[in-house]
């Protein structure tokens, strides 16, 4: 029988940061096991706690025993959009729709508050994450290489409010255009290691003027 799940903001649920941190580490072990590295995966409990303090967190709880099964952490920018920091589901519960339930609750919550879209990044070397985002209405709109990550990353955007460029059939075309521009900028301005090359350094200096 399928478990009954309750979705709440952590402001309501009051799950301790230690439990959130433990779930985060368990959920993202798959990444390190697959050789995917990122600075966020090395955060201490104290650093993780500071992220939680300045973010909105939704949690998925077992309706019978209130066990923590999943969480989604995001922060709001300029009132127009939110940036997803991370989405974590207990390993034994992955593939059962908990992440999608969390997302659905959050979209309703954000629409009521006038948000227009969600953004996030994920490693290009994590196909399970890439496919989940595409399946749940996100579009790939960016490409980047960084000195601090072991693999290139994709930037995703999920429209949550009506918009001409982000309604079908224009949304896929808009996303492809943004992705192509981002891919070109990254490959023109950065080396394979993610460092800025001379073109990138010149562009950065000109933007500061």
At which residue positions do the language-model features occur?
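A short beta-loop-alpha structural element at the N-terminal edge
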Residues: 2-22
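Acetyl-CoA-dependent GNAT
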Residues: 22-85, 90, 103
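Conserved acetyl-CoA-binding loop-helix of GNAT-fold acetyltransferases
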Residues: 89, 95-108, 135
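Conserved GNAT acetyl-CoA-binding A-motif
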Residues: 110-122
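Conserved beta-strand-loop-alpha-helix junction that forms the acyl-donor binding cleft
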Residues: 120-130, 147-150
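Conserved acetyl-CoA-binding loop of GNAT-fold acetyltransferases
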Residues: 133-144
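C-terminal "cap" of GNAT-fold acetyltransferases
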Residues: 146-209
């Amino acid at each position: 029988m399928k478990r009954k799940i309750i979705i709440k903001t952590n402001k309501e649920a009051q799950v301790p940061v230690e439990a959130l941190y433990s779930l985060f580490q368990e959920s993202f072990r798959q990444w390190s096991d697959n050789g995917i590295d990122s600075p966020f995966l090395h955060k201490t409990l104290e650093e993780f706690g500071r992220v939680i303090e300045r973010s909105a967190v939704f949690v998925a709880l077992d309706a019978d025993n209130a066990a923590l099964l999943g969480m989604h952490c995001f922060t709001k920018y300029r009132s127009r959009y939110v940036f997803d920091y991370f989405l974590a589901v207990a390993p034994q519960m992955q593939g059962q729709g908990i992440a999608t339930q969390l997302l659905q609750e959050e979209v309703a919550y954000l629409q009521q508050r006038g948000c227009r879209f969600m953004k996030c990044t994920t490693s290009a070397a994590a196909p399970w994450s890439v496919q989940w985002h595409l399946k749940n209405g996100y579009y790939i709109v960016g490409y980047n290489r960084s000195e601090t990550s072991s693999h290139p990353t994709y930037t995703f955007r999920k429209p949550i409010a009506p918009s001409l460029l982000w309604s079908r059939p224009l949304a896929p075309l808009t996303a492809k255009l943004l992705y192509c521009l981002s891919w070109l900028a990254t490959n023109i301005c950065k080396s394979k290691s993610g460092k800025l090359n001379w073109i990138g350094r010149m562009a950065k200096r000109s933007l500061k003027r």
